[in-house]
């Protein structure tokens, strides 16, 4: 019975792992796009005088983008931590399955 439960648990954990990896990938992609946007704002801002109101608006937008990037980084760290936990539990289930299989097929 433990073998079946552990096998089902492993399938569930594998699905959770794939979901977390996908979310991490999306966040990484979004952060890359944010950095590109920040760099574009910096390049546009360099064309204007520093006292120009447009530059102030661009700096505010850049600050908002950096704040969003920090939030995404925190979210990604949370997902990475959850992923490590899932992988640890998956390995534990895998070890129990291997032990149950070895015990089932050993002749004593």
Predicted feature locations:
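Amphipathic alpha-helical polymerization modules
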Residues: 1-108
């Amino acid at each position: 019975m433990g073998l079946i439960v552990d096998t089902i648990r492993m399938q569930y954990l594998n699905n959770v792992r794939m979901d977390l990896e996908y979310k991490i990938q999306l966040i990484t992609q979004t952060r890359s796009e944010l950095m590109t946007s920040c760099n574009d704002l910096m390049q546009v801002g360099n064309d204007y005088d520093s006292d120009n109101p447009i530059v102030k608006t661009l700096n505010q937008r850049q600050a908002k983008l950096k704040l969003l990037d920090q939030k995404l980084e925190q979210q990604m760290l949370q997902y990475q931590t959850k992923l490590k936990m899932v992988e640890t539990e998956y390995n534990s289930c895998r070890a129990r399955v291997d032990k149950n299989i070895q015990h089932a097929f050993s002749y004593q």
